[in-house]
Amino acid sequence: MSGDEMIFDPTMSKKKKKKKKPFMLDEEGDAQTEETQPLETKEVEPEPTEDKDVEADEEDSRKKDASDDLDDLNFFNQKKKKKKTKKIFDIDEAEEGVKDLKIENDVQEPAEPEDDLDIMLGNKKKKKKNVKFPDEDEILEKDEALEDEDSKKDDGISFSNQTGPAWAGSERDYTYEELLNRVFNIMREKNPDMVAGEKRKFVMKPPQVVRVGTKKTSFVNFTDICKLLHRQPKHLLAFLLAELGTSGSIDGNNQLVIKGRFQQKQIENVLRRYIKEYVTCHTCRSPDTILQKDTRLYFLQCETCHSRCSVASIKTGFQAVTGKRAQLRAKAN
């Protein structure tokens, strides 16, 4: 059937595809092709063909849509990474695991206890220290050093069978320390009241100071302090007036009236200097002393250690001019 003879049929929507037939030879040797053979056009029923074609198209479109969706999902999943779930550390399970590991290590290597310590401390291996054993010479040197330190410590205890000096009965010469110890021992025997290493305190009544008017000060218990110090009032009065740089006198009530304003602290400081210089012994610091005057010098004699030493004479200090200079010059002339 040629192309000119083909008639357009509007009822036909689609034509079936022609099946290709293989090239066949007839018995006569004439080759027949599909074009030479007369083909009868069969009218296709419209209804069944249209339904089949529509269904086929729908299936193809569904498959394409499904494949497109799968591709989109795969692409989306590649972009999104899954979050790793954090494993919760269980202490009980870890302890059980450590115990199991301990048991296995004990069974396999019972002679190495360091592996157990490594497991307990988070697999941290300790460095092995090389233990050095000291020699006998080092031990002897340490013992001698300890003995020297013990001998240096003075605990007041000494063990000796000797009653006399340490050098007695031997040809060796005595040392300075031995002589010094002998001197202190003799002092303790002669003076049992004295205790070596302790300072004797001199206790005295505080001075009573009263303000008299606006320009004078009264030392109330002056005579009582003179009796406690075993000193003459004239000597103490001269020292007080010289140190304070003023003038004063003793009234009828045996009170020292000093010209000027003075506080109790100032008089206490003056009395402390007087006691240190003219009362206490310069050798043993004992207050049991006697002040004697020989020719023009004063001597301090101790009744405890029987020492005798000279003391400085009282000198008047600087005195400021308080009155009018014209009146002083007139009196002098």
Swiss-Prot record:
<dbReference type="InterPro" id="IPR045196">
    <property type="entry name" value="IF2/IF5"/>
</dbReference>
<feature type="compositionally biased region" description="Basic and acidic residues">
    <location>
        <begin position="40"/>
        <end position="51"/>
    </location>
</feature>
<keyword id="KW-0479">Metal-binding</keyword>
<dbReference type="GO" id="GO:0001731">
    <property type="term" value="P:formation of translation preinitiation complex"/>
</dbReference>
<dbReference type="GO" id="GO:0002176">
    <property type="term" value="P:male germ cell proliferation"/>
</dbReference>
<feature type="modified residue" description="Phosphoserine; by PKC; in vitro">
    <location>
        <position position="13"/>
    </location>
</feature>
<feature type="compositionally biased region" description="Basic residues">
    <location>
        <begin position="13"/>
        <end position="22"/>
    </location>
</feature>
<dbReference type="GO" id="GO:0001701">
    <property type="term" value="P:in utero embryonic development"/>
</dbReference>
<dbReference type="GO" id="GO:0003729">
    <property type="term" value="F:mRNA binding"/>
</dbReference>
<keyword id="KW-0832">Ubl conjugation</keyword>
<keyword id="KW-1017">Isopeptide bond</keyword>
<dbReference type="GO" id="GO:0008584">
    <property type="term" value="P:male gonad development"/>
</dbReference>
<keyword id="KW-0862">Zinc</keyword>
<feature type="modified residue" description="Phosphothreonine">
    <location>
        <position position="36"/>
    </location>
</feature>
<protein>
    <recommendedName>
        <fullName>Eukaryotic translation initiation factor 2 subunit 2</fullName>
    </recommendedName>
</protein>
<keyword id="KW-0396">Initiation factor</keyword>
<keyword id="KW-0597">Phosphoprotein</keyword>
<dbReference type="GO" id="GO:0005829">
    <property type="term" value="C:cytosol"/>
</dbReference>
<dbReference type="GO" id="GO:0045202">
    <property type="term" value="C:synapse"/>
</dbReference>
<dbReference type="InterPro" id="IPR016190">
    <property type="entry name" value="Transl_init_fac_IF2/IF5_Zn-bd"/>
</dbReference>
<feature type="region of interest" description="Disordered">
    <location>
        <begin position="139"/>
        <end position="165"/>
    </location>
</feature>
<dbReference type="Pfam" id="PF01873">
    <property type="entry name" value="eIF-5_eIF-2B"/>
</dbReference>
<feature type="modified residue" description="Phosphoserine; by PKA; in vitro">
    <location>
        <position position="218"/>
    </location>
</feature>
<feature type="region of interest" description="Disordered">
    <location>
        <begin position="1"/>
        <end position="120"/>
    </location>
</feature>
<feature type="modified residue" description="Phosphoserine">
    <location>
        <position position="2"/>
    </location>
</feature>
<feature type="modified residue" description="N-acetylserine">
    <location>
        <position position="2"/>
    </location>
</feature>
<keyword id="KW-0648">Protein biosynthesis</keyword>
<dbReference type="GO" id="GO:0031369">
    <property type="term" value="F:translation initiation factor binding"/>
</dbReference>
<dbReference type="GO" id="GO:0003743">
    <property type="term" value="F:translation initiation factor activity"/>
</dbReference>
<feature type="modified residue" description="N6-acetyllysine">
    <location>
        <position position="293"/>
    </location>
</feature>
<feature type="modified residue" description="Phosphoserine">
    <location>
        <position position="158"/>
    </location>
</feature>
<dbReference type="InterPro" id="IPR016189">
    <property type="entry name" value="Transl_init_fac_IF2/IF5_N"/>
</dbReference>
<dbReference type="GO" id="GO:0002183">
    <property type="term" value="P:cytoplasmic translational initiation"/>
</dbReference>
<feature type="compositionally biased region" description="Acidic residues">
    <location>
        <begin position="106"/>
        <end position="118"/>
    </location>
</feature>
<feature type="cross-link" description="Glycyl lysine isopeptide (Lys-Gly) (interchain with G-Cter in SUMO2)">
    <location>
        <position position="102"/>
    </location>
</feature>
<feature type="modified residue" description="N6-acetyllysine">
    <location>
        <position position="265"/>
    </location>
</feature>
<dbReference type="GO" id="GO:0008270">
    <property type="term" value="F:zinc ion binding"/>
</dbReference>
<feature type="modified residue" description="Phosphoserine; by CK2">
    <location>
        <position position="67"/>
    </location>
</feature>
<dbReference type="InterPro" id="IPR002735">
    <property type="entry name" value="Transl_init_fac_IF2/IF5_dom"/>
</dbReference>
<keyword id="KW-0007">Acetylation</keyword>
<comment type="subunit">
    <text>Eukaryotic translation initiation factor 2 eIF2 is a heterotrimeric complex composed of an alpha (EIF2S1), a beta (EIF2S2) and a gamma (EIF2S3) chain. eIF2 is member of the 43S pre-initiation complex (43S PIC). eIF2 forms a complex with at least CELF1/CUGBP1, CALR, CALR3, EIF2S1, EIF2S2, HSP90B1 and HSPA5. Interacts with BZW2/5MP1. Interacts with EIF5.</text>
</comment>
<feature type="compositionally biased region" description="Acidic residues">
    <location>
        <begin position="139"/>
        <end position="149"/>
    </location>
</feature>
